[in-house]
Amino acid sequence: MELVMKDAQGALTVSETTFGRDFNEALVHQVVVAYAAGARQGTRAQKTRAEVSGSGKKPWRQKGTGRARSGSIKSPIWRSGGVSFAAKPQDHSQKVNKKMYRGALKSILSELVRQDRLIVVEKFSVEAPKTKLLAQKLKDMALEDVLIVTAEVDENLYLAARNLYKVDVRDAATIDPVSLIAFDKVVMTADAVKQVEEMLA
């Protein structure tokens, strides 16, 4: 199949298996959820009644005071007491096979092509690391919410994009399922397309 180049004459020939496969919603959902879960810190921690600092002595005798019976100042009912079912640090990561991960990326890329959300260009760069230059370039292309993917890390482009809302710059080796579906449009250079194709082959 062929992808039309926006800034040059002609088209780029690409693999049908990478950019023309059916959309597998269940697979994409599973991989996206797993990827997002892997980004969780999982470091939150609370103390149970066994871990809270304080005396183990019964606050007052069982009967005769007129007050409600109480056996510990560490009770979850009490202020500064322990937490019932306290949260503990945990690993939220989920296992995703390489074949599944690659399949999800291919599925997403194919859907981007079908929805005309993937824009292929010969090259994409700015002369200097100036936000103003990139903002004007995107305005000329009628792009706002966009992920820019280049073959190699372009420092000028990266620095220029840092202060732009809903604009991100990645090199082909660091694309991920969440980023690809998070933006309205994805701009990829021809070299990046070839690199992604080789990576997912």
UniProtKB/Swiss-Prot annotation:
<keyword id="KW-0687">Ribonucleoprotein</keyword>
<dbReference type="GO" id="GO:0006412">
    <property type="term" value="P:translation"/>
</dbReference>
<keyword id="KW-0694">RNA-binding</keyword>
<comment type="similarity">
    <text>Belongs to the universal ribosomal protein uL4 family.</text>
</comment>
<comment type="function">
    <text>Forms part of the polypeptide exit tunnel.</text>
</comment>
<dbReference type="InterPro" id="IPR013005">
    <property type="entry name" value="Ribosomal_uL4-like"/>
</dbReference>
<comment type="function">
    <text>One of the primary rRNA binding proteins, this protein initially binds near the 5'-end of the 23S rRNA. It is important during the early stages of 50S assembly. It makes multiple contacts with different domains of the 23S rRNA in the assembled 50S subunit and ribosome.</text>
</comment>
<keyword id="KW-0699">rRNA-binding</keyword>
<dbReference type="InterPro" id="IPR023574">
    <property type="entry name" value="Ribosomal_uL4_dom_sf"/>
</dbReference>
<dbReference type="GO" id="GO:0003735">
    <property type="term" value="F:structural constituent of ribosome"/>
</dbReference>
<dbReference type="Pfam" id="PF00573">
    <property type="entry name" value="Ribosomal_L4"/>
</dbReference>
<keyword id="KW-0689">Ribosomal protein</keyword>
<comment type="subunit">
    <text>Part of the 50S ribosomal subunit.</text>
</comment>
<dbReference type="GO" id="GO:0019843">
    <property type="term" value="F:rRNA binding"/>
</dbReference>
<protein>
    <recommendedName>
        <fullName>Large ribosomal subunit protein uL4</fullName>
    </recommendedName>
</protein>
<dbReference type="InterPro" id="IPR002136">
    <property type="entry name" value="Ribosomal_uL4"/>
</dbReference>
<feature type="region of interest" description="Disordered">
    <location>
        <begin position="44"/>
        <end position="71"/>
    </location>
</feature>
<dbReference type="GO" id="GO:0005840">
    <property type="term" value="C:ribosome"/>
</dbReference>
<dbReference type="GO" id="GO:1990904">
    <property type="term" value="C:ribonucleoprotein complex"/>
</dbReference>
